[in-house]
Amino acid sequence: MLFAYIRGNNDAAVKMNMTAPVLVNIHPRTEHLQNSTYVVHFYVPQKFQRNPPLSAEAQPVELPQHKYAAVRRFGGFMDDSNISVQLSALKKSLKGTGRDKSSASIQHSGRFLLYSAAGYNSPFEHENRVNEVMLWFD
């Protein structure tokens, strides 16, 4: 749906270049039988940011305005398993910093908040890939 939007399936029939990063906000499951929720964000090019073309299928949204993030960079293709491994490593690196219990991915007031994964490369690039996992702080 989002790829079709940037390829011209929008009210203005405007094709846009793909931008980076592709950001995936991940809302962890709160109960054992639930699935995590993934929300994928494509950034629109700067010339469309004030007035992005509308679409019945893809809805422009503003991202949450978190103040800070702890970030861990990693290579390769991004998937559920390496996101999980990298997120665990990022959480481990925060132990004892005062941020280890305040990140948005830690349970807060009975609910889990989001963390994000970002991919910076085209799916056709196979070498020197750059990805990040992010824990958000307010």
Where are these regions (language model features)?
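A solvent-exposed interaction/effector surface
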Residues: 1-138
